From Swiss-Prot:
The lineage of its organism: Bacteria, Bacillati, Bacillota, Bacilli, Bacillales. The gene is rplL. Belongs to the bacterial ribosomal protein bL12 family. Signal peptide: none annotated. CDD domains: Ribosomal_L7_L12. Keywords: Ribonucleoprotein, Ribosomal protein. GO terms for biological process: translation. It holds the Pfam family Ribosomal_L12_N. GO terms for cellular component: cytosolic large ribosomal subunit. The keyword Ribonucleoprotein applies. This is Large ribosomal subunit protein bL12. The keyword Amino-acid biosynthesis does not apply. Forms part of the ribosomal stalk which helps the ribosome interact with GTP-bound translation factors. Is thus essential for accurate translation.
C-alpha cells in the first residue's frame, strides 16, 4: 500500500482534469461531498423536482469554427493551463464548470458563444 508521501507525489503530477475525476471517484466511493457546506445544503434540496434549479453545469457542446478563441476563453474561465484547456475543448461535449449560480453560468455561456462555441446549461 502506498504511503502518504507517495500519494501526495502522485497527486502533484496530475492535471486539473485528472484531479477532478479523482475527487468524483472519492465522493462516490465514500459517499461524501467535497462541496462547501452552503453548496451541500443547496445540493440536498436539489432532489425535489418541483424546486427551482439554482446551480447549473456549463457544458461545451462544440468549439465551432473559432477553436483557438474558444480555447482561450475556456482557459480564462476555468484557470486551466493552455494544454488542459485545449484538451477540454477537443473533448467536447464536456462540462467546463459545475454547480455555478444561474447568473454566472449564463454569463459564461454568453462569453463562450461570443467566440463561436456551442454551449448548454444543465
Amino acid at each position: 500500500m502506498a504511503n502518504q508521501e507517495q500519494i501526495i507525489e502522485a497527486i502533484k503530477e496530475m492535471s486539473v482534469l485528472e484531479l477532478n475525476d479523482l475527487v468524483k471517484a472519492i465522493e462516490e466511493e465514500f459517499g461524501v461531498t467535497a462541496a462547501a457546506p452552503v453548496a451541500a445544503a443547496g445540493a440536498a434540496g436539489g432532489g425535489d423536482a418541483a424546486a427551482e434549479k439554482t446551480e447549473f453545469d456549463v457544458e461545451l457542446t462544440s468549439a465551432g469554427s473559432s477553436k483557438i478563441k474558444v480555447v482561450k476563453a475556456v482557459k480564462e474561465a476555468t484557470g486551466l493551463g493552455l494544454k488542459d484547456a485545449k484538451e477540454l475543448v477537443d473533448g467536447a461535449p464536456k462540462v467546463i464548470k459545475e454547480a455555478m449560480p444561474k447568473e454566472d453560468a449564463e454569463k459564461l455561456k454568453e462569453q463562450l458563444e461570443e467566440v463561436g462555441a456551442s454551449v448548454e446549461l444543465k
